Design a protein with these regions (language model features):
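C-terminal structural segments of small proteins and small subunits
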Residues: 62-90
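Short S/T/G/P-rich N-terminal loop/turn motif that feeds into the first structured element of a domain
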Residues: 1-53, 59-66, 70, 93-95
């Protein structure tokens, strides 16, 4: 079943550290079945707290999504992301 990972950037705390995350996350995608659907496109919050940006990634199934998220390369990228911003990450299965 298709599975999606949704990331919302709640607050940037250190832009220089966050800038290092992008290349690391890109490298971590190699060898994984993921499709970016939304990458910081124009957005509008209709309910809830404001966000700075949204990323939505599509995976063929939950196992593939968690395999990428917990991979050594993305774990290192994620730790870098934590140095530069506060995010919310959600995994959700599609229909």
């Amino acid at each position: 079943m298709a599975t999606y990972m949704i990331f919302t950037r709640e607050k940037t705390t250190n832009q220089a550290e966050l800038d290092k995350y992008g290349p690391m996350a890109g490298a971590a995608s190699a060898g994984h079945e993921l499709t970016p659907l939304v990458v910081y496109g124009k957005h509008e919050v209709l309910e809830g707290a404001p966000t700075e940006g949204v990323v939505i990634l599509s995976f063929p199934n939950r196992e593939a999504a968690l395999g990428w998220y917990n991979s050594p390369l993305y774990t290192a990228a994620r730790e870098q992301r934590f140095k530069g911003a506060e995010y919310r990450a959600i995994i959700v299965e599609g229909i």
